[in-house]
Design a protein with these regions (language model features):
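Alpha-helical transmembrane segments
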Residues: 24-32
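Short, strongly hydrophobic alpha-helical membrane anchors
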Residues: 1-11
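Low-complexity, Ser/Thr/Pro/Gly-enriched N-terminal "stalk/linker" regions
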Residues: 41-119, 130, 134-172, 214, ...
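C-terminal functional modules
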Residues: 321-390
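Aromatic-rich carbohydrate-recognition surfaces in CAZymes
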Residues: 114-124, 172-197, 270, 363
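Extracytoplasmic mature domains of secreted/periplasmic and thylakoid-lumen proteins
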Residues: 165, 178-191, 197-227
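Long, repeat-rich segments with strong aromatic
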Residues: 248-341
Length: 392
């Protein structure tokens, strides 16, 4: 009787298969645990919301024709997209006290590892505030998302968060912070203060002050040669709470660095350009007198070249940044373009899009884009008090 020996290659393949099965089982456990805890928490005392979904965005007055564009139908689609986002991407941490937006799975040695990024986490915070309804459990979810960020400090900047974390490890490696993600986190904290007033586990004001000062310190220490996202919308919101000349200086420096890219490139924009165009669009919607006019011509020119691409939304433009995320980032600027046929086509493409299983960022950007097109986005201050949109 002959026995075939196992080669090193066979052993490696077998171990990889075992690792993949272990990841699947672990993920299944996390999903079931998340669903069970959600059911339990739905029975707890709910949190009142000061701005329950849906609200009417202040920028609707700038877009009179858009105001009449099927608000109820779009809200129904948005609610469904939000439910799918919550089901497909939000998971509880191992301790049950944290929550994270699951992203790509990476292979480390013979093991497959779940990951989450601080940018996706920051957007999840923002979405939780925007979609909160009176009496739901959004505040508890917000606190768990925030707890995850606080539990994964960045390298050399412990008050900020590591740009990438590995939620299913007892200890996750400390990596550098994503400063653009940090700005989204700060904006979400401000919105949470307006929505709920306070949190049960954390002092919103203390967390905001500590992180905003840490972001200032990180910006001062970062190399001028490092590519940064142009963030006039977010930095303006932060500057209103933490005055410092650096916010304006940083905004101008980032704009000068972005201009050559906007002039040269074609097709859907890559990560830096797309996130910057999103910021320009949001600035134009909420703060049209804050310098949008001087940036609009170049931004609209880039937008037209981006929207000329009618390729399918599946796949990535660059590692970790999908075509869906890129197109979604263009939407607020497209609203200001005031071409109804363009926005109608964008709504059709986004509402029918199916985010890839590991594309948490694309799924979150899609939700943000759909909120802007539904006209329900609101800010914490310095905008006209919105009138709730009926969904009856």
């Amino acid at each position: 009787m002959h026995y075939q020996s196992i080669t090193p290659q066979d052993a490696t393949g077998l171990l990889s298969l075992i690792g993949l099965v272990a990841l699947f089982v672990g993920l299944l456990v996390l999903v079931r645990r998340t669903q069970r805890r959600r059911n339990e928490e739905s029975k707890k005392t709910p949190s009142p919301a000061a701005k329950p979904f849906p609200q009417a965005a202040s920028y609707l007055q700038l877009l009179p024709s858009f105001r009449q564009a099927y608000p109820h139908e779009r809200q129904v689609v948005l609610r469904q997209a939000h439910e799918e986002w919550q089901t497909n991407f939000l998971l509880r941490g191992l301790d049950g006290q944290t929550e994270f937006l699951r992203g790509e799975t990476y292979k480390r040695g013979l093991r497959y590892q779940l990951t989450s990024t601080s940018l996706a986490q920051g957007l999840a915070l923002f979405i939780r505030v925007q979609m909160a309804q009176d009496g739901d459990v959004s505040r508890g979810s917000f606190e768990r998302l925030l707890a995850h960020l606080l539990g994964h400090p960045a390298l050399d900047h412990p008050a900020l968060s590591s740009w990438l974390s590995m939620p299913d490890l007892p200890t996750s490696p400390r990596l550098e912070p994503d400063l653009h993600a940090e700005a989204w986190i700060l904006a979400s904290l401000l919105a949470a203060k307006t929505q709920w007033g306070s949190l049960e586990r954390f002092n919103l004001e203390d967390v905001f002050q500590e992180r905003s000062q840490a972001l200032l310190d990180a910006l001062k220490s970062h190399s001028e040669n490092q590519a940064r996202v142009f963030s006039p919308f977010l930095l303006r919101m932060i500057a209103q709470q933490v005055p410092d000349p650096l916010w304006k200086t940083q905004t101008e420096a980032d704009w000068q660095a972005l201009k050559p890219l906007l002039r040269e490139e074609e097709g859907l924009p890559g990560r830096q350009q797309a996130l910057s165009l999103l910021q320009i669009g949001l600035e134009g919607l909420f703060f049209p007198d804050n310098g949008f006019a001087k940036r609009s011509s170049m931004a609209f020119s880039r937008l037209k070249r981006a929207l000329a691409s009618q390729e399918p939304l599946e796949g990535e433009l660059e590692e970790g940044f999908s075509r869906l995320a890129s197109l979604s980032c263009c939407v607020p600027l497209a609203l200001l373009y005031k071409k109804e046929e363009v926005t109608a086509q964008l709504w059709s493409r986004l509402s029918q899009a199916q985010p890839a299983k590991q594309d948490a960022l694309g799924a979150s950007m899609r939700l943000l884009a759909m909120m802007s097109m539904t006209g329900t986005l609101w800010l914490e201050k310095n905008e006209a008090e919105p009138t709730p949109i009926t969904s009856e």
